[in-house]
Amino acid sequence: QHWSDYFKPG
């Protein structure tokens, strides 16, 4: 997973 997945999962 990427750090952005925690802010905008998808």
Swiss-Prot record:
<dbReference type="InterPro" id="IPR002012">
    <property type="entry name" value="GnRH"/>
</dbReference>
<comment type="function">
    <text>Stimulates the secretion of gonadotropins; it stimulates the secretion of both luteinizing and follicle-stimulating hormones.</text>
</comment>
<dbReference type="GO" id="GO:0005179">
    <property type="term" value="F:hormone activity"/>
</dbReference>
<dbReference type="GO" id="GO:0005576">
    <property type="term" value="C:extracellular region"/>
</dbReference>
<comment type="similarity">
    <text>Belongs to the GnRH family.</text>
</comment>
<feature type="modified residue" description="Glycine amide">
    <location>
        <position position="10"/>
    </location>
</feature>
<keyword id="KW-0873">Pyrrolidone carboxylic acid</keyword>
<protein>
    <recommendedName>
        <fullName>Gonadoliberin-1</fullName>
    </recommendedName>
</protein>
<keyword id="KW-0027">Amidation</keyword>
<keyword id="KW-0372">Hormone</keyword>
<feature type="modified residue" description="Pyrrolidone carboxylic acid">
    <location>
        <position position="1"/>
    </location>
</feature>
<keyword id="KW-0964">Secreted</keyword>
